[in-house]
Regions:
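Hydrophobic alpha-helical segments
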Residues: 1-211
C-alpha cells in the first residue's frame, strides 16, 4: 500500500496518509485539461527538474519547459511570462491545472524529504480523456497571474479549475488545518497554532514564497 510510512522516525497521522493516497488517485485520473497520463508525466518532469536532471521526452517541449520553470525556477514566473504561455499552446486553465498538480506534488515530496524518506513512486495513470469542463465565469484578476475567485484562501489560486481547488484544500486540511480550524488561534495538534505559523512563515521566507 502506498504511503504506509513504515520506516518513519515518528508516527504519521492517519489522515495525512489517507489524504496522500487520495491525492495520488486524483493525480492519476484524467483531469479537466490534461489526461491522467499527462498529469503523471507533468509530475515526473517536475521531479526531474528538481533533481537537476535532463528533460524527458514524454511531454511536448513547450509544456515540459513550463513545468520545469514552475517547479525549479519559479523566480522566472511573471505576469508577462504567464501571458505568453498561450502562444506555446498552454492556455490559462491548462496552466492552472499544472499549478495545482505541482503544488500538491511539492507538498507530498517535501514531506518525505523532511523525514529523510525516499519519494513515493508516482502512480500508474488511469485511462480516459480530460473533461474539458469550461471554467467558472465569476473570476477576476487580483494580484495573481491567473483569474481566480475572490476568497482569502491559497487553494483559490487555481479556481479556474475547481477540482484542483478541492484537491488542494483537502490535502491542506490534513497536512495543515481546516478552514474552520484556522479561526481558532489556540488550535493545537502536535504543535500549537503559534508554533505551526512560525514554521510556516519561516519556510515561506526561505523559499521566497510571499503572499
Amino acid at each position: 500500500m502506498s504511503f504506509n510510512f513504515a520506516d518513519t522516525p515518528i508516527p504519521i497521522r492517519t489522515e495525512i496518509q489517507e489524504a496522500m493516497r487520495k491525492e495520488w488517485a486524483f493525480l492519476a485520473a484524467p483531469g479537466t485539461w490534461w489526461s491522467g497520463e499527462e498529469r503523471v508525466q507533468i509530475a515526473a518532469e517536475a521531479r526531474r527538474a528538481m533533481a537537476g536532471e535532463r528533460s524527458g521526452d514524454e511531454l511536448p517541449a513547450a509544456v515540459a519547459g513550463v513545468v520545469r520553470t514552475v517547479a525549479a525556477n519559479s523566480p522566472l514566473v511573471s505576469a508577462e511570462w504567464v501571458e505568453g504561455l498561450a502562444a506555446k499552446g498552454v492556455d490559462m486553465p491548462a496552466y492552472a491545472e499544472i499549478i495545482g498538480v505541482l503544488a500538491r506534488l511539492s507538498a507530498v515530496d517535501m514531506f518525505h524529504r523532511a523525514l529523510g524518506l525516499p519519494l513515493e513512486p508516482l502512480p500508474d495513470p488511469e485511462p480516459g480523456k480530460p473533461s474539458r469542463t469550461p471554467p467558472p465565469t465569476n473570476l477576476v484578476f487580483g494580484k495573481s497571474f491567473v483569474p481566480m475567485a475572490i476568497m482569502v484562501s491559497i487553494p483559490q489560486t487555481v479556481s479556474l479549475v475547481p477540482p484542483e481547488t478541492v484537491a488542494w484544500q483537502e490535502l491542506s486540511d490534513a497536512m495543515y488545518m481546516t478552514l474552520g480550524e484556522m479561526g481558532n488561534p489556540d488550535f493545537r495538534q502536535a504543535l500549537h497554532r503559534t508554533q505551526m505559523e512560525l514554521v510556516a512563515a519561516r519556510t515561506s521566507q526561505i523559499n521566497e514564497c510571499f503572499y
